[in-house]
Amino acid sequence: MISTPLSKEFEWPAKPVSLELQHQVEQFYYREAQLLDHHAFQAWFALLAEDIHYWMPIRTVRTAREQGLEYVPAGANAHFDDTHATMYGRIRQKTSDLNWAEDPPSRTRHLVSNVIVREMDTPGTLEVASAFLLYRSRLERQVDVFAGERRDVLRIADNPLGFQIAKRTIILDQSTVLANNLSVFF
């Protein structure tokens, strides 16, 4: 079996984090969603760590015995495989007057739930799994719904929201993306 970064399930914490930390992480996600839904892309970009890895692997349909091959391995083709520099380019494109894929802009609603926080061995670093639902309305009749799981590595940071995103893996539930484009951020 090919080993992929998703071969290992999210490691549940031995004990829950404090209610205060859980609340802080959830509030961070709610504010992040609001930034994206209100097209505050520069403010959202400021939440990304310099060493960010923003990855959405391609998912394939496999039989029960081939579930370990469901996702493409790291380094293979992916919907997104971005660094800080490529995310900056996507933000610049999205906010320019020449962004044909997003003119007029999409209207989005990011919903985040089922947030599970685990403190990592490195102080100030958290591993977080969450469920998401992203609704996008575009033009007059185009509607897209994306559902899945995000696996993030957050670092405590000196910014207004208290954290920065060091890694985001987006695991779509659907294997075939029916949307005209993927010009949204998850």
Swiss-Prot record:
Q: Name one Pfam family in it.
A: Ring_hydroxyl_B
On subunit structure and binding partners, the annotation says: Heterohexamer consisting of 3 BphA subunits and 3 BphE subunits. A ferredoxin (BphF) and a ferredoxin reductase (BphG) must be present to obtain activity.
Lineage at the top is: Bacteria, Pseudomonadati, Pseudomonadota, Betaproteobacteria, Burkholderiales
Instruction: Write down what this protein is called.
Output: Biphenyl dioxygenase subunit beta
> Which reactions appear under catalytic activity for this entry?
biphenyl + NADH + O2 + H(+) = (2R,3S)-3-phenylcyclohexa-3,5-diene-1,2-diol + NAD(+)
Gene name in the database record: bphE
Keywords recorded for this protein, A-Z: Aromatic hydrocarbons catabolism, Dioxygenase, NAD, Oxidoreductase
Cited InterPro entries: NTF2-like_dom_sf (IPR032710), Rng_hydr_dOase-bsu (IPR000391)
CDD domains in alphabetical order:
ring_hydroxylating_dioxygenases_beta
The record's function comment reads:
The beta subunit may be responsible for the substrate specificity of the enzyme.
Q: Which organism is it from?
A: Comamonas testosteroni (Pseudomonas testosteroni)
Which Gene Ontology terms cover its molecular function? biphenyl 2,3-dioxygenase activity
Q: Name one GO biological process term.
A: 3-phenylpropionate catabolic process
Q: Which family does it belong to?
A: Belongs to the bacterial ring-hydroxylating dioxygenase beta subunit family.
> Looking at the record's lineage, which domain of life comes first?
Bacteria
The pathway is: Xenobiotic degradation; biphenyl degradation; 2-hydroxy-2,4-pentadienoate and benzoate from biphenyl: step 1/4
Q: What EC designation does it have?
A: 1.14.12.18
